[in-house]
Amino acid sequence: VSVALSFSAVQEKFNELQRDYSVLQSWRLTRDHAKRRAGVCYPLKKRIAISHYHIQLNSLSVIIDTLVHEVAHALAFELHNETGHGPHWRRWVTQLGGEAKVTGNFSVPETHWVLVHKQSDSLVQLARRHRKNKRIKDFILKGRPDTRGQLFYVSSAQFLAWQSGELLLSEVELIQ
């Protein structure tokens, strides 16, 4: 199923919810390019956004569940002036047929970079990142000023190759 078809189905569900709940008439549904979250509700802008990557990587039922989660935020805001995952949101998400959970179980895009701490002849993975921070050479581990200059980015592919023994540490490109 293409991203366009999936978004069309999500838009249809949103239109249905707008017909059922008149307070949603002035709201818009859009796509964005978030990589670390599935959807977001902007109450003051009256806009709900679903991630293009979420649509690309997940089933329609998972995407619709995300829409329901965000519409529950919109209804809780419009009818109760509540933001966040409070009691009104929980009631709305349940009433709409969703699960009252703050985070869902869904696929996210692979990251391009791994943030590592170089320790003598080893690399310790600290985090995965979609983008590199240009000031990495100034970073330290919390409470560890001795780690200045020891934090690097490594491409995800090279890190996996090093982990599996396909690359020696001396062959890994460490980027600061």
List PLM regions with ranges.
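Metalloprotease/metallohydrolase-associated module, dominated by Zn2+-dependent proteases
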Residues: 2-61, 78-176
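Active-site recognition of the HExxH zinc-binding catalytic motif
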Residues: 65-77
